Amino acid sequence: LDGIEKITGVRPAFEQVDLRDKAATEAVFQKYPAIAGIIHFAASKAVGESVQLPLLYYRNNVVSLINLLELMPAYGVKGIIFSSSCTVYGQPNPENLPVTEDAPHQKATSPYGNTKEINEQIIYDFIHSGAAVKSIVLRYFNPIGAHPSALIGELPNGVPNNLIPYVTQTAMGIREQLTIF
């Protein structure tokens, strides 16, 4: 939040809420009646962990989205940007490269990927049910980076879940080597 404020001159409101808790989530809608749209980036995202703890991933990633979608029309929130994943494309075959948004979805290779596929379908069904809500779904291919000021962006603490933090930690001498297999 400090970084955003330094860059923009505006300190964003921050509410720490478990989106699985519908009553707590609704309290945020009530506190901020002028919400115009939602950018939903909140999700568990470690592929390996999702294999070990699949129910946690389904509960967190799917229930949180359902709660948001159920509350949006009641509070006049007209749009949602959803952070999905390239995992909805599965393991692409060489003949299907490069992958475009028109590429066919394949069976997810992890519970994490499956939650993203399920959530995309939930959003599609919700929008096509006549809900007065519009959606954008973003399918990332391992997003990385930070603002040029370095005030906001990726700052992994502990074991990273993406490649670039491993590379930078190795370059800085925090890690002795980077093993590629």
Language model features with spans:
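N-terminal Rossmann/SDR dinucleotide-binding element
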Residues: 1-37, 159
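Serine-hydrolase catalytic-loop signature spanning alpha/beta hydrolases and amidase-signature enzymes
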Residues: 46-50
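Catalytic helix-loop patch of NAD(P)-dependent Rossmann-fold dehydrogenases
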Residues: 52-59, 63-70, 74, 78-79, ...
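Short, well-ordered coil/turn elements that cap or connect secondary structure elements
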Residues: 7-9, 75, 130-132, 173-175
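Residue-level signal for alpha-helix termini/capping positions
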Residues: 30-33, 73-74, 128, 172
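Alpha-helical substrate-binding/gating segment
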Residues: 143-146, 164-181
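Conserved NAD(P)H cofactor-binding loop of Rossmann-fold oxidoreductase domains
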Residues: 39-45, 84-85
